[in-house]
Swiss-Prot record:
Top-tier EC class: lyase
GO biological process, one term: terpenoid biosynthetic process
Record field: catalytic activity: presqualene diphosphate + H2O = hydroxysqualene + diphosphate
Keywords in alphabetical order: Lyase
Protein name, entry field: Hydroxysqualene synthase
Pathway assigned in UniProt: Secondary metabolite biosynthesis; hopanoid biosynthesis
Origin: domain of life: Bacteria
UniProt family annotation: Belongs to the phytoene/squalene synthase family. HpnC subfamily.
Gene Ontology molecular function terms on file: geranylgeranyl diphosphate synthase activity; lyase activity; squalene synthase [NAD(P)H] activity
PANTHER family hit by this protein: BIFUNCTIONAL LYCOPENE CYCLASE/PHYTOENE SYNTHASE
Job of this protein: Involved in the biosynthesis of the hopanoid precursor squalene (SQ) from farnesyl diphosphate (FPP). Catalyzes the second step, the conversion of presqualene diphosphate (PSPP) to hydroxysqualene (HSQ).
Gene that this sequence comes from: hpnC
Length: 292
């Protein structure tokens, strides 16, 4: 088989909508985090590849898993992550969970309700936060807030990309029961502008996601590592801003994203608040709820 590396989209950690191993994170952690990212990005690109059939995608994902577990040396991203984890004495559990999500991307194109979407997030998003916490030696008591934040980020992304996911991959993460309740049809996702019913569905899901992100807001204060706490505060601020935009905008007719200057302002505002909180030993900074 062709190396999975050759199927990469070309997207790197610098192209993501959120920080990945940014300058905020201590340099001693960056190599491992980037090894994890490159493995995950490779698997994600395979699952989303428009020219591969489903069986071939699953074969590649199985190959990445096998080599991550030590059975082979042909896939650079898997071998690099395996060695990086071994150096730190960490198991591959979070990467394996993410492979479960990518297999779901290949085999499951529709979701019946919110609970099914959250179940998907358990494998597609929550392992990323748990991995970062484990890398920094944080307690598993932080997982609850981390899971909420990561799931909120994932659903934000689902809403932002709902049109593209449907048109290019026939993949729909919007719960079927929510579409039905709003009177919307899956086919509406192929339009250049949301129908009133679809817009109602999307904005209602954004409101629900805002509540989920609220459950993640204590995370920065629960984290002991100073730098990771700052990074999480930035990610939370980014997620809150995006979900506010999704409550009032149409992701089919416009790209819902932060401009670079908006991201910089949000980042430094969040870091400043977190620095103040940590300097004075206070509890979580109270941010406005992410509502329109």
């Amino acid at each position: 088989m062709t190396s999975a590396s050759e199927l990469r989209s070309g997207k790197t950690h610098r192209d993501e909508n959120f920080p990945v191993a940014s300058w905020i994170i201590h340099p001693r952690h960056r190599d491992l985090i980037l090894a994890f990212y490159n493995f995950v990005r490779t698997a994600d690109d395979i699952a989303d590849h428009e020219m591969l059939d489903g069986d071939t995608k699953l074969e590649y994902l199985d190959l990445l898993e096998a080599e991550l577990l030590g059975r082979g040396e042909t896939q650079p991203e898997a071998v690099h992550l395996r060695r990086a984890l071994a150096e730190r004495g960490m198991p591959p559990r979070h990467a394996l969970d993410l492979l479960t999500a990518f297999r779901m991307d290949v085999t499951k194109l529709r979701y019946e309700d919110w609970d099914e979407v959250i179940h998907y997030c358990r494998y597609s998003a929550m392992p990323v936060g748990r991995f970062m916490l484990d890398v920094h030696g944080e307690s598993t008591t932080t997982w609850q807030a981390s899971d909420a934040l990561c799931a909120g980020l994932q659903i934000n992304n689902h809403l932002q990309d709902c049109g593209k996911d449907y048109r290019t991959l026939n993949r729909v993460y919007l719960p079927r029961d929510v579409l039905d309740a709003a009177g919307a049809k899956v086919e509406d996702l192929g339009l250049q502008k949301s129908s009133p019913a679809l817009l109602k569905c999307l904005q209602g899901l954004a409101v629900r996601t805002a509540s989920l992100l609220g459950d993640g807001r204590p995370l920065a204060a629960e984290i002991k590592d100073y730098r990771l706490g700052l990074e999480v505060s930035v990610i939370q601020a980014y997620a809150d801003r995006i979900v506010r935009m999704l409550q009032t905008r149409d992701p089919l007719s416009e790209r819902v994203h932060l401009k670079p200057i908006e991201f910089v302002i949000a980042s430094f505002g969040a870091m400043s608040s977190e620095i103040v909180r940590r300097s004075f030993g206070k509890g979580p900074v109270s941010h406005p709820a992410p509502r329109a």
